[in-house]
């Protein structure tokens, strides 16, 4: 973490400067003590075998008397009780008001709505400083993608400074894996590194991964490539110091080829965890689920995503969880068949990011990994996804909704242009924001237009339904009547570039 210094969208220089103030404000001669910490790490390493950390754990955790135990128990129907209590409270308050006081509240509400709909004056808006478009760099930084080969497998080398960290991704093309196995492939990505292997319990494996690497994970990703075209990938990735690359690949082999996919008790535990997490995801980030579900009616890309992480996957996991004993054999067979079809040499591409060492430094490790892959089989046709227009609604226990609608403008004969990125900014921070958020509607509202044509509107934590759809319906009228002066258009364009032109970390290459 220290060497990576990954601050997300914020520039490193800015974040280092803020860190310096933690000491610099109090000692003019020590601006760098919170940045130069290699010496501290060296001292901590020397204490590993001296009982230092065990002493800290015993003193501040095990023998610490300052603790509390909190038990949270669910109560069926609690939300209905709270809703009724609130309704009774509001009714009692209204009954306590005189007729004049009620009229006053109604009038104040009307005034509030009027103020929400009232636009700021031009003079007020021009008090806000705006940079010039000429201040924005127009050239795009070129990406470093040097193609080579190791062990007969294509390697993409991204030459960026990584502070002696190697970032390795082993990507496997899943285009030939049939749709009935896709949920099992998604589940496979979830369980790798958290099930027992031939040589480790899953707890020991987790410790070994943490000691020797910056993490090992498996993910499924799907990338749109053209209108109604996509590329599904199964990715094993790790990051480690150059000096630990041999151990990192040993662990990658252990995870990919030695994982026990038939441990019944452990599989049931993991399925329960995934089921719970998916339920939480559907309620806390339901706007993403709603938007992708709506796009899945016409987009093969979105329909595939549904099968691996959306409502469709939730329904699959729910069945596994509720009928586990009956489904167990199917789950194990599905996992093993998915792994066999994925882990073939002909599917594999390696992505490596690092500058101090060329890819050849891990040649022996890559070749050893390739030896463990399944023998290449004749592949079937590229997977096809069937889209079904359903127009659905899903009930949850929450008191708010996530309202989405979607379509594809390329299917209507229109082409993508960069102006749609600016329109997305205008919609999100002007039209949708004012018509929905400011006027007491959803807590959030957003839209997107992809270069494949997929488009959507969606709200976040929305108390309304029909009202939000009416706003969506009038979006075209808003664009037809849209007018803005040079200053406003400059703000929209600058805001659009600001959302795109962010630091990209080596780990993201």
Residue ranges and their predicted role:
Residues 1-45, 65-75, 163-193, 197-325, ...:
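M16 family metallopeptidases and their MPP-like homologs
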Residues 39, 50-59, 152-155, 172-174, ...:
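Short alpha-helical segments and helix-capping/turn motifs at coil-helix boundaries
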Residues 35, 42, 55-142, 279, ...:
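Long, compositionally biased intrinsically disordered regions
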Residues 10-30, 34, 96-189, 193, ...:
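His/Glu-based metal-binding/catalytic segments typifying zinc-dependent metallopeptidases
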Residues 49, 129-132, 201, 263, ...:
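A diffuse structural propensity rather than consistent per-protein peaks
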